[in-house]
Amino acid sequence: MYRINLTTFTLLLVLAVGSLMSESLHPSDGAINDLYEYLLQREYAAPVSYADHQIKRKAVRSPSLRLRFGRRSDPSVPLRPEEDELIDQKAIRAPQLRLRFGRNDPLWTSFNENALLEENFEKRAPSQRLRWGRSNLFGNLVNQFQQDDVMQQKTIRAPQLRLRFGRTDPSWAMYNEHQLTTGQQAQPANEASEKRAPTQRLRWGRSDPALAKDSSEDKALDVEESENTNADDK
């Protein structure tokens, strides 16, 4: 009797465990449908998290966004008249300063607006150029106030002492002008065709102005000596 009761209890236990295992392997259709509906809802705050992976569904996009095949709007939704008016009334933008790769400089947006105003300004006067194309600031101010006088009363400048590579020594400019005016006053009209006295040449064909005066004095002494000799011979 005891053996029969033990065998019956064992069979009942095996059947109970088998039924539980079969239910866990084959869930009901209701649980699957609930999970499917939960995943297909329109929006939710957090993604559905599982132990081995994650599933996240995006919210439904509005029809104004770009759809398939490059369409900007849903063909079933009509366009608003405000957008058409804005497209028709869109003005052509002014040309802007282009940077590399077609970018625009935001600092130069008002450049074209002021371009017409800058054209009305007077052009700058020609300035005295220094070495390497630099301009003399003092010369610019003088040209701005005396532009007409300089252009009308411009005369041929006197020969100046040239330095190396064609540069001019400004300290000799006034000296050469003074020498030129005094020489023109001292020379008589009949000696205009007389050749100048040979002077000692410096480097690059320059003449020493200090020796020019000495050569003229020597020539005058030679003339006086020749006259004295002619008088003695007579």
Curated annotation (Swiss-Prot):
Which portions of the sequence form the region Disordered?
Answer: 181-234
Provide ranges: composition bias, Polar residues. 181-190
Where in the body, by tissue, does this protein show up?
Expressed in all body parts of larva, pupae and adults.
Q: Which residues form the propeptide?
A: 23-56, 207-234
Signal peptide span per the entry?
A: 1-22
Give the chief site where it resides.
Answer: secreted
Q: Which residues carry this modification: Tryptophan amide?
A: W132, W204
Give GO terms: molecular function aspect only.
neuropeptide hormone activity
Q: Where in the cell is it found?
A: Secreted
Q: Write out the coiled-coil annotation as residue ranges.
A: none
| Positions carrying Phenylalanine amide | F69, F101, F165
GO biological process, any: regulation of multicellular organism growth
**What GO terms fall under cellular component here?**
extracellular region
UniProt keyword terms in alphabetical order: Amidation, Cleavage on pair of basic residues, Neuropeptide, Secreted, Signal
Protein family: Belongs to the NPY family.
**What role is this protein assigned?**
Plays a role in controlling food intake and regulating body size.
Report what the protein is called: Short neuropeptide F
